[in-house]
Amino acid sequence: MARYDRAITVFSPDGHLFQVEYALEAVRKGNAAVGVRGSDTVVLGVEKKSTPKLQDSRSVRKIASLDTHIALACAGLKADARVLINRARVECQSHRLTVEDAVTVEYITRYIAGLQQKYTQSGGVRPFGLSTLIVGFDPYTDKPALYQTDPSGTFSAWKANATGRNSNSMREFLEKNYKETSGKETIKLAIRALLEVVESGGKNIEIAVMTQKDGLRQLEEAEIDEYVAEIEAEKAAAEAAKKGAPKET
């Protein structure tokens, strides 16, 4: 049993690669992350741990730009994320130099997933302990896209998805409430999904919004607080309306 448990390239008798499963467990223990694709907007949101008083909070951002039209959020080991993000950025620039055109969102997703898969079957390495949510606008179609990859190298396209801590709760919320919206409504849906699992409201949330026209923009804490206040007001109004509704006889 111990041999299957430790060796990265050896399957257990029942078909498991334990090191990949342990990497998936690292993702489940990581920060919550959510991605939502709207009609003209894509939004990434992550759970933000409170930083020590003397630490520069800008140095611990969990949403990264890969190119002018692609961004990535991740859940899992931050050091692994840094390596994967740097490799993806180099690939984006290399593609521009070689092909003289920007990568598509699917292309860079395939590259990242391929890299993650390679690290599940090579000796002397271990799987990346992170799952990624990749958003952007394709340069040829101008359509928004959202993809997810995991430590096994699997990738898939989504309308909305979540990963990390309590991702099942967020995913259930998104399944019940997702509609293809635009602008502010897309941002609010991502924040509402995060508020399902994140305590202390907006101060523990990091949000990035991308549009075809303006590119990627990180929301300031004050902007997030405004959205949270609006969401809480809507929730209170809905509860009041429910209490005031006449009971059916």
Curated annotation (Swiss-Prot):
GO terms for biological process: ubiquitin-dependent protein catabolic process. Keywords: Cytoplasm, Nucleus, Proteasome. It is found in: Cytoplasm; Nucleus. InterPro entries: Ntn_hydrolases_N, Proteasome_alpha, Proteasome_alpha-type, Proteasome_asu_N, Proteasome_sua/b. CDD domains: proteasome_alpha_type_7. GO terms for cellular component: cytoplasm; nucleus; proteasome core complex, alpha-subunit complex. Disulfide bonds: none annotated. The keyword Nucleotide-binding does not apply. The 26S proteasome consists of a 20S proteasome core and two 19S regulatory subunits. The 20S proteasome core is composed of 28 subunits that are arranged in four stacked rings, resulting in a barrel-shaped structure. The two end rings are each formed by seven alpha subunits, and the two central rings are each formed by seven beta subunits. The catalytic chamber with the active sites is on the inside of the barrel. Belongs to the peptidase T1A family. This is Proteasome subunit alpha type-7-B.
